[in-house]
């Protein structure tokens, strides 16, 4: 009875309003609610990320409790059993896995059910009462491992029944996964529906690419190293490629993928976010709003995408998937040129390339510099200088440059200065993107999350092209699985000014 009375008393005092992050306490009871807890995203990404944060000491068992919520009617132990197989295990951490799983409680309910969310709030409040026997705040983090179609109803339920009620302070935050709409209109509609219920500082639009180690390194590389500052502009850089390649197809996700295609799935969000970090001006400080302000300026400086600077492809066999329509016009491959109309980047093509069922798996940024004027060594035919940042697999960065070939003759050869993370940082475990981003959410750091005006500007760039594709005005070119993609894409790169170094392959240093 005492616990029940205290929960009711706590509920009588509401504290939903946003306050400056610098003044919000980050200690006290923490409730992490995984909505869609029985789904693949939660099992494969969210819960493993939470476990890794727990085992590294970022989630303290005396403060945190994790709640799974979904429509599936299962018990606490059923959910724990489903999750266990996805957590890194070995004899050395069996105990940690068991301890972590005991922090998880499951609540079943629909996503528009007042009864379900009332039960969820009761479970959270009981946890908060038990943890807050001494003075402390209560923090509620809702992670949406859900399709966007249910975001509005879930947000209404949270706002009505599950907001932080502690009279000791704290916060309520929501983490929402992409896709954030299919075009400008649907994205704005979704943003408005969520924005009516939560303030912008309470909304964390997650793009897991912003949590990758070398993506997070971009601003440090650009603004903490003196020699990059005078080179990073149109006077020295000829073109920039941002590439995402997969060597497998849709693999059972054909029906889902066909609704979106490679541009919506990869280019409009992941690769565009990388482009912003590559192209933005130096922010006033490291504060999230200063960084995001500069990213928005880049997006607002972009010119409309021209059809003649776009090549689309669809791998042969894509429509063999029974969930894909026979008349599908959805691209599984795209190469396009984006152009920024500002003083730093006028005339420099940003080449975005993404595709499935290609000949390799990698993601990288390739900055190609201009030819050396007055080439007295006649070495430009060997290739241009390039700075390459390998995002995955095997994180690395290297500078491709021309040196004298060892020997008695004055001849040149291409070589590289490189930094392989696997070699340089042996024994250092590079965190998964979801670990970083969930920790950022708990800390109230929105630097690596997408702001509403940033999202709007991104959709303004791509919506006209996407509508032309949806209407069948732009057709994908068939290409063979395991190839480089359509030959027309290589022609587009050449026309944009990219000079390929034939026969040169960077070999990562061995351990």
Swiss-Prot record:
Q: Which residues bind D-glucose 6-phosphate?
A: 178, 208-212, 246, 265, 356, 361, 392
Q: What class of enzyme is it?
A: oxidoreductase
Where in or outside the cell?
Cytoplasm
**Part of which pathway?**
Carbohydrate degradation; pentose phosphate pathway; D-ribulose 5-phosphate from D-glucose 6-phosphate (oxidative stage): step 1/3
Q: Which residues form the active site?
A: 270 (proton acceptor)
Q: How does it assemble?
A: Homotetramer.
Q: Which PANTHER family does this UniProt record tie to the protein?
A: GLUCOSE-6-PHOSPHATE 1-DEHYDROGENASE, GLUCOSE-6-PHOSPHATE 1-DEHYDROGENASE G6PD
Q: What's the protein called, per UniProt?
A: Glucose-6-phosphate 1-dehydrogenase, cytoplasmic isoform
Q: Which organism is it from?
A: Solanum tuberosum (Potato)
């Amino acid at each position: 009875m005492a616990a029940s009375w205290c929960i009711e008393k706590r509920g009588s005092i509401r504290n939903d309003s946003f306050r400056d992050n610098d003044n919000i306490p980050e200690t006290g009871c923490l409730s992490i609610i995984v909505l869609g807890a029985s789904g693949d995203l939660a099992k494969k990404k969210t819960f493993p990320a939470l476990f890794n944060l727990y085992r590294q000491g970022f989630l303290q068992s005396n403060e945190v409790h994790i709640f799974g919520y979904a429509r599936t009617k299962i018990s606490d132990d059923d959910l724990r059993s489903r999750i266990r197989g996805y957590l890194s295990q070995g004899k050395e951490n069996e105990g940690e896995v068991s301890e972590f799983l005991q922090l998880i409680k499951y609540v079943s309910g629909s996503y528009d059910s007042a009864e379900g969310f009332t039960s969820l709030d009761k479970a959270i409040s009981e946890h908060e009462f038990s943890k807050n026997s001494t003075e402390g705040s209560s923090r509620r983090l809702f992670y949406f491992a859900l399709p966007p179609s249910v975001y509005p109803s879930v947000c209404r339920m949270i706002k009505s029944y599950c907001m932080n009620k502690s009279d000791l302070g704290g916060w309520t935050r929501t983490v929402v996964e992409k896709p954030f709409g299919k075009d400008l209109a649907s994205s704005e509609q979704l943003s408005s529906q969520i924005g009516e219920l939560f303030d912008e500082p309470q909304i964390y639009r997650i793009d897991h690419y912003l949590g990758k180690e070398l993506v997070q390194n971009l601003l440090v590389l650009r603004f903490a190293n003196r020699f990059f500052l005078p080179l990073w502009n149109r006077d020295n850089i000829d073109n920039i490629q941002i590439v995402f390649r997969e060597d497998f197809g849709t693999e059972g996700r054909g029906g889902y993928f066909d609704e979106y295609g490679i541009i919506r799935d990869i280019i409009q969000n992941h690769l565009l976010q990388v482009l912003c970090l590559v192209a933005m001006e130096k922010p006033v400080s490291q504060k999230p709003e200063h960084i995001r302000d500069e990213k928005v300026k880049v997006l607002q400086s972009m010119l409309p995408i021209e059809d003649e600077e776009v090549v689309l492809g669809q791998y042969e066999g894509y429509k063999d998937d029974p969930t894909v329509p026979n008349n599908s016009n959805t691209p599984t491959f795209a190469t396009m040129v984006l152009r920024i109309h500002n003083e730093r980047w006028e005339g420099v093509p940003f080449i975005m390339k993404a595709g499935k069922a290609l000949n390799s798996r990698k993601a990288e940024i390739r900055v190609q510099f201009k030819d050396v004027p007055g080439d007295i060594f006649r070495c430009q035919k060997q290739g241009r200088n390039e700075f390459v940042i390998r995002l995955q697999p095997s994180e690395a960065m290297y500078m491709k440059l021309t040196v004298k070939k060892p020997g008695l003759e004055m001849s040149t050869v291409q070589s590289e200065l490189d930094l392989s993370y696997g070699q340089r940082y042996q024994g250092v475990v590079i965190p998964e993107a979801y670990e970083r981003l969930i920790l950022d959410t708990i800390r109230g750091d929105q630097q690596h999350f997408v702001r509403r005006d940033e999202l709007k500007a991104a959709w303004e760039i791509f919506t006209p092209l996407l509508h032309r594709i949806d209407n069948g005005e732009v057709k994908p070119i068939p290409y063979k699985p395991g190839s480089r993609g359509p030959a027309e894409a290589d022609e587009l790169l050449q026309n944009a000014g990219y000079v390929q170094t034939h026969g040169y392959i960077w070999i990562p240093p061995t351990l």
